Amino acid sequence: MAKLALINREQKRADLVKKYAGKRAELKAIIDDHSKSEEERYEARLKLQALPRNSAPTRQRNRCALTGRPRGTFRKFGLGRIKLRECAMRGEIPGMTKASW
């Protein structure tokens, strides 16, 4: 089980990403628009840099929803590999069966 502080930190990051997503998209559109003047693009870049660091989606880390484990997490299920296997063996994930060939 990951420390509760790490899980809370990730939740805080997810909230910040949602909060600033629109603002970041607007500023990035201005920066990428070559029809704008250099000054406008530069100001947009400064405003983007002034936003909180944790509002960038690349700062997020996928964690297991049950344990908070940061590595070996399956995006589709939101679970770590260990908990995914346990849930699959108990039949809690519809349509998932153990592979055999």
From Swiss-Prot:
The keyword Kinase does not apply. One of its GO terms (molecular function) is rRNA binding. The keyword DNA repair does not apply. Signal peptide: none annotated. InterPro entries: Ribosomal_uS14, Ribosomal_uS14_bac/plastid. GO terms for biological process: translation. GO terms for cellular component: cytoplasm; small ribosomal subunit. Keywords: Ribonucleoprotein, Ribosomal protein, RNA-binding, rRNA-binding. It comes from the Bacteria. Belongs to the universal ribosomal protein uS14 family. Binds 16S rRNA, required for the assembly of 30S particles and may also be responsible for determining the conformation of the 16S rRNA at the A site. Part of the 30S ribosomal subunit. Contacts proteins S3 and S10. This is Small ribosomal subunit protein uS14. It comes from Herminiimonas arsenicoxydans. The lineage of its organism: Bacteria, Pseudomonadati, Pseudomonadota, Betaproteobacteria, Burkholderiales.
